[in-house]
């Protein structure tokens, strides 16, 4: 069986990992093994972070909507139920923006939800 020399492939792989580890402290930016571990961990954390960011923003929007609806005398869950029954299809991101930037329009939405709940 012929001998396999991996010089160029290994060099390319090492350079790629060390390039990703640029800016890390100490051996994590200089030594391949520790740099590789750090890069793998960093990429995994970045992936998880992108998923968590979506959850965090949704939580933030819900908290903002809840605060605004309680100022208008309704709870978040009742408001969402009333608005859904009224056939108003606005996502939570837009509702939170309306609650912050246009309180009068949001108060009208709360009134629509209240009427729908009473009907």
UniProtKB/Swiss-Prot annotation:
This is Large ribosomal subunit protein bL20. InterPro entries: Ribosomal_bL20 (IPR005813), RIBOSOMAL_L20_CS (IPR049946), Ribosomal_protein_bL20_C (IPR035566). It comes from the Bacteria. SUPFAM superfamilies: Ribosomal protein L20. Belongs to the bacterial ribosomal protein bL20 family. The gene is rplT. GO terms for molecular function: rRNA binding; structural constituent of ribosome. One of its GO terms (cellular component) is ribosome. One of its GO terms (biological process) is ribosomal large subunit assembly. Keywords: Ribonucleoprotein, Ribosomal protein, RNA-binding, rRNA-binding. Binds directly to 23S ribosomal RNA and is necessary for the in vitro assembly process of the 50S ribosomal subunit. It is not involved in the protein synthesizing functions of that subunit. Pfam families: Ribosomal_L20.
């Amino acid at each position: 069986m012929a001998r396999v020399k991996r010089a160029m492939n290994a060099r390319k792989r090492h350079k790629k990992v060390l390039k990703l580890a640029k800016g890390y402290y100490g051996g994590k930016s200089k030594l391949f093994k520790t740099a590789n571990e750090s890069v793998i961990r960093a990429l995994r954390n970045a992936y998880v972070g992108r998923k968590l960011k979506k959850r965090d923003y949704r939580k933030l929007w819900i908290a903002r909507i809840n605060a605004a609806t309680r100022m208008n005398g309704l709870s978040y869950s009742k408001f969402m139920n009333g608005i859904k029954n009224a056939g108003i299809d606005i996502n939570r991101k837009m509702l939170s923006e309306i609650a912050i930037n246009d309180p009068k329009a949001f108060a009208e939405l709360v009134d629509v939800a209240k009427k729908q709940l009473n009907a």
